[in-house]
C-alpha cells in the first residue's frame, strides 16, 4: 500500500527517484499517466491492468467514458525502475503536470501521485480549507 508524502528532485534527464519503501511494490514495472488536478498518476502494472479492464468494460457510447478513457489510456506510458530506483517521466507528462525541478510523490493506497511542488502546496491549501465539507460529504457515503 502506498501512503505518505515525499519530496524529490527531477534530474536533468527527466528522472525521479522512487521512494525506497515503494520500490518493492513496483518490481513488475509501472504505468504513469495524466492524472486529475494536474498531477500524474503512477500505478503498479497489476493495478493499472485492473483500471484498464474496468475502463474497457464501460460503454463507449457515453461521452464521459470516452473522455476519461482518452485521458487515462492515451496519455499512459510503461515505466521501468532503473538500478538506482529512478523512473523516467516522459516530457509530455512533465509538461502536463508542470513538473520542473522539485517534485512531490504522494502515496494514495493503490497509486502514487506525482506533483510539481508548488502545485501540490496550492492544492493542499485549498483542500485543507474545505476539509470539514469534504469530511461531511464522505460521511454521507459511509466513510
Where do the language-model regions lie?
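Flexible "stalk/tail and boundary" regions
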Residues: 1-8, 12, 22-79, 83, ...
Amino acid at each position: 500500500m502506498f501512503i505518505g508524502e515525499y519530496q524529490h528532485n527531477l534530474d536533468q534527464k527527466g528522472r525521479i527517484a522512487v521512494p525506497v519503501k515503494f520500490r518493492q511494490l513496483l518490481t513488475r514495472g509501472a504505468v504513469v499517466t495524466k492524472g486529475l488536478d494536474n498531477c500524474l498518476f503512477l500505478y503498479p502494472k497489476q493495478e493499472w491492468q485492473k483500471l484498464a479492464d474496468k475502463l474497457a468494460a464501460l460503454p463507449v457510447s457515453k461521452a464521459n467514458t470516452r473522455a476519461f478513457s482518452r485521458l487515462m489510456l492515451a496519455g499512459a506510458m510503461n515505466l521501468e525502475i532503473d538500478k538506482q530506483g529512478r523512473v523516467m517521466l516522459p516530457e509530455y507528462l512533465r509538461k502536463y503536470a508542470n513538473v520542473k525541478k522539485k517534485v512531490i510523490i504522494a502515496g494514495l493506497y493503490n497509486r502514487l501521485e506525482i506533483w510539481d511542488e508548488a502545485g501540490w502546496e496550492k492544492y493542499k491549501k485549498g483542500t485543507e480549507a474545505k476539509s470539514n465539507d469534504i469530511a461531511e460529504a464522505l460521511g454521507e457515503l459511509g466513510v
